[in-house]
Amino acid sequence: MASSCLFNASVSSLNPKQDPIRRHRSTSLLRHRPVVISCTADGNNIKAPIETAVKPPHRTEDNIRDEARRNRSNAVNPFSAKYVPFNAAPGSTESYSLDEIVYRSRSGGLLDVEHDMEALKRFDGAYWRDLFDSRVGKSTWPYGSGVWSKKEWVLPEIDDDDIVSAFEGNSNLFWAERFGKQFLGMNDLWVKHCGISHTGSFKDLGMTVLVSQVNRLRKMKRPVVGVGCASTGDTSAALSAYCASAGIPSIVFLPANKISMAQLVQPIANGAFVLSIDTDFDGCMKLIREITAELPIYLANSLNSLRLEGQKTAAIEILQQFDWQVPDWVIVPGGNLGNIYAFYKGFKMCQELGLVDRIPRMVCAQAANANPLYLHYKSGWKDFKPMTASTTFASAIQIGDPVSIDRAVYALKKCNGIVEEATEEELMDAMAQADSTGMFICPHTGVALTALFKLRNQGVIAPTDRTVVVSTAHGLKFTQSKIDYHSNAIPDMACRFSNPPVDVKADFGAVMDVLKSYLGSNTLTS
């Protein structure tokens, strides 16, 4: 049996408490870590260990890569993955090695990364839970990464030496206690801060996978001279950083005057070749696809399904942070729409492999100025119509013709999902409200929070539902929008929750008068 590969005392999990913090705390802190012994594909023990609880002492001349090489197992890897057409018809035999440079199926459709689920199923859910838990908080290469700690489910065949990682992932799952209670009447609201990452957005999760595979392809002498992407900001930041780390040239197509300066400076600082093009994201996307068809530049946009393999680990991580309890709702901002499918894929793999018994309902939240999925949903999933996106403060999702529309629709149908939208005023107000309770979120998270407000008001999400809002980028990338909001400088917007600074003379009496007015006349009485 596969479970014979896991040596671990049988300890029952503590019963969940009503207090969200107690429910959230991992019981793994109260038990011994497992010792994982390497197994053949049929579950029989073999001599060489994959991981052991006790490792040889660290040699001072080793870095973590050297140490990983020295401790490398000679065990046969039973896991594999390949490209297949997305949502292929039953009986389809079309497939491609991950070492091939291919982005579309023969019919022109999207590709997906398909894992050998039968090989993965030879090990039960308890095995995978304990293996993933045993890697948390470690510096062992490459498992200290929140992505590569799930390597067997991501790129199982890549050599550790080819991996390009900043130990991304492992991002904070924040209990939004005050915000939930004050504004929504909720006691179990969480924000998954994927923007607390190497380059400040969730795109790092996918880019570590894609650039690692490119690193492998280049070592195999495949024709890849660089990696290119079209971007609304965050993709280019992640691509340029990971390529710089590996010494791989990066080429970035950006829509002129449509991203924040904080986003623009990241690829420039990391040495990318940046083209500022007089078009929108959809125009940049069209150009990069045409260019990569003619030049040996590897395409890094989410048309490439490798990125979704890294992004799906955020879903697995949420379950792990809840000690493998499933939340009721997960709300994800959507632009190019790969991320909503990635989250679905992560949750679904956990269900299929026995780590959990169900998946959450998901919500995709769009800006009203760039809402083709929302309109498609409201039409009853009738014929999808691309649109020309208007300017939105949520610039990273200002996309009118999303590449992953089919993936998003598939995921939402499978999880009984919902699509909501947010106007500019709604998303900025939601961002300000969240910030006033101790967060510092991006406008895209404001879109997701607006969706939550609407679904709470409609009674769709109950006050006791455990709900996770996915925050996709760091608020520090979008400070100008916050400055404009709190300065009441946005035309035709009331900025109801603005908090502008108060000008006051450098005089003791003047300062005292202002403070008494703010705090109440009796507060400062001696």
UniProtKB/Swiss-Prot annotation:
Q: What is its EC number?
A: 4.2.3.1
Q: Which cofactor does it need?
A: pyridoxal 5'-phosphate
Q: What is this protein called?
A: Threonine synthase 1, chloroplastic
- Origin species: Arabidopsis thaliana (Mouse-ear cress)
Other facts noted in the record for this chain: Binds 4 S-adenosyl-L-methionine (SAM) molecules per dimer. Although SAM3 and SAM4 have equivalent positions, their interactions with the protein are not identical. SAM3 interacts with Lys-181 and Asn-187 of monomer B, whereas SAM4 interacts only with Lys-181 of monomer A. Much more active than TS2 at physiological concentrations of S-adenosyl-L-methionine (20 uM).
Q: Which NCBIfam families match?
A: thrC
Query: Which residues are listed for pyridoxal 5'-phosphate binding in this entry?
Result: 335-339, 472
Q: Where in the cell is it found?
A: Plastid, Chloroplast
Q: Which residues bind S-adenosyl-L-methionine 3?
A: 181, 187
Query: Which gene produces this protein?
Result: TS1
Q: Provide the domain comment.
A: The N-terminal domain (1-77) is essential for regulation by S-adenosyl-L-methionine and AMP, but not for dimerization.
Question: Which InterPro entries does the UniProt entry name for this protein?
Answer: Cys_Synth/Cystath_Beta-Synth, Ser/Thr_deHydtase_PyrdxlP-BS, Thr_synthase-like, TrpB-like_PALP, TrpB-like_PALP_sf
Kindly report, in one word, the top-level EC class recorded for this enzyme: lyase
GO cellular component, as recorded: chloroplast; chloroplast stroma; plasma membrane
